[in-house]
Amino acid sequence: MGDKFSVPTNQSKERQPIVKKKKKKKRTNIYSYILIISFPVIDQFQMSESLNIQELTDNSSIIPIPTESTDVQDVTSVSNKDTTTTTTTTTTTTESTTRVRKSSPSPSANENDKKRLKKEFQPRQKIEYTPLVDENGQPIPKAPRKPKRKVAVMLGYCGTGYNGMQVQNDPNVKTIEKDIYDAMATAGAISAENAVDLKKSGFQRAARTDKGVHAAGNVISLKMIIEDPEIINKINDLLPKQIRIWGIQRTTKGFDCRKCCSSRIYEYLLPTFSLLPPKPKSVLSELVKEKKLENPDLFEDDQEGIDWWENVKSKILASGITQEQIDSITSSYDEQQQQQQQQQQQQADEEERDISELSFTKLIKQIKTIENQSRRSYRISSSRLQHFREVMKQYEGTHNFHNFTVGKPFKDTSANRFMIKTIVSDPFVIEGTEWISIKIHGQSFMLHQIRKMIAMAALVVRLSLPCGIINNFFQSTKINIPKAPALGLLLENPVFDGYNIKLTKSDYEPIDFTKFDKEMNEFKMKYIYDKIYAEESKENIFYGFFGYIDAYRGNKNEDGEPIQNGASIFDFLFNYTERVENTKNKDAKNTSKTEESKPEESKPEESKSEQS
């Protein structure tokens, strides 16, 4: 027994390399076996933490190696006293083994510690709180902190006089969001510390509107203090009458109104006289005449438009204006004749020139007055309205709308947008002018997309072109499409169909504008529709827009040469006739080939029957 538990001397150093190899090979299995046997009695014995274990023989005998002599005596005495030395040795060995593992870290741990110690200690920078100051420079005492909740704010506004919805970096720019945020901070819905920056409240809008664009319903999401039950009334009292808060509703913490919005509904109000054909003898009207002579079958018959302009002409002649005067005014749109008139006026005396200019301007005003009165009294026919509805239906589905926005190439995948539905209402009369309402329900929209869609559809109807021409604007050819006036555009409301399911599961109310229908309709009639009607009757915005298109000749440089930044809208419209002819010729060739191929296929069958 003494030999078995004897302490190894320096003579055993020669066997050390062999011991290390066996130690690496069998150490783990032996220790796990010992732990299983001695686990119930480990707590009954204590042993010094300085013991090391070495494996000396092939039969895996374990020898504790003390660092001090006292520890050796204790161990040998235990082994000589009774017959339980085996259990004691095994238990103490296991105890020491576990303690040795804890006290001797792995080489990788030591390396990590060294690297950590090499790094210089960098204390955390202490950020001092800078209190807000008033106008006199005195610090404003910090208000007690109140709980904030993530909410969805449903609102409506008239965009007249505002530079769009989104707040700008320049504080002097008037925006819808700036007025709303200031009113919320004043009403106590936003703390003074967070009132200086929208990002601190997690501010986000569901849809961004441009300058002059209205919204009957829109949603913003942010963290607000909503303890006060009268918070909506307080905010509305601080806002101008053309901005209203419909409701404030609790949402989940991760709610983002822009990302959670599944689709959006826009409305565009258009006077029906915008769908009338171009003015006779205008630039666009003459181009249509040329193409009708080349392809009479392409353009649809528009006897209604011809009769309407003849009626206007008869009213002008009845007012005392002669046909020569009408022709002179119409030809004044021609650049060459304008130059001739300028040369003639320069040769004439100043007095005569002033008299002629005055009479000419009076004549133009008189003719425009008669034309405007005729436009106001125009009532659209069912066939023209149906044509416009069919053109608007061409936008439904997923298409590449790169031609209906700015700065989007055809290969940009973000130009692909999904239009869910388009609805054109029945005509209605407001203050003597007939209007139609166009609602476009889409998943998302790009900059100027709706205004370009309306302008393109109106041009197709005005020129009596087929509905299928719209599909060619989704191709790779870059086309310059004009924008319809922003006056008639408004956001009806964003839709949260998908997110409302999640809200109802979390015991929250869905985001729905139908419960505010009465208030929203009253607001639209008073602050949106009436302003649109009044501004159109006063400024003649739609009449000026389509009149400009009828007389448009293209941009020119200093030398008078046309500038081509992509194909012109009219070039594409009239090149469509050539494409139709090419497709017709291809179809005719294909049909002729199929007819010729049929008898060729039947000849082998006849020959086979003859042979049989």
Curated annotation (Swiss-Prot):
Annotated catalysed reactions: a uridine in tRNA = a pseudouridine in tRNA; uridine in snRNA = pseudouridine in snRNA; a uridine in mRNA = a pseudouridine in mRNA
Cofactor: record remark: Binds 1 zinc ion per subunit.
Keyword set includes Translocase: no
Pfam families per the UniProt record, alphabetical: PseudoU_synth_1 (PF01416)
Compositional bias ranges of the Low complexity kind: 83-97, 336-347
InterPro entries reported in the protein's UniProt record: PsdUridine_synth_cat_dom_sf, PsdUridine_synth_TruA, PsdUridine_synth_TruA_a/b_dom, PsdUridine_synth_TruA_C, PUS1/PUS2-like, TruA/RsuA/RluB/E/F_N
A GO CC annotation given for this chain: nucleus
Isomerase keyword on record: yes
PANTHER family registered for this protein in UniProt: PSEUDOURIDYLATE SYNTHASE, PSEUDOURIDYLATE SYNTHASE 1 HOMOLOG
Name of the featured protein: tRNA pseudouridine synthase 1
UniProt organism field: Candida albicans (strain SC5314 / ATCC MYA-2876)
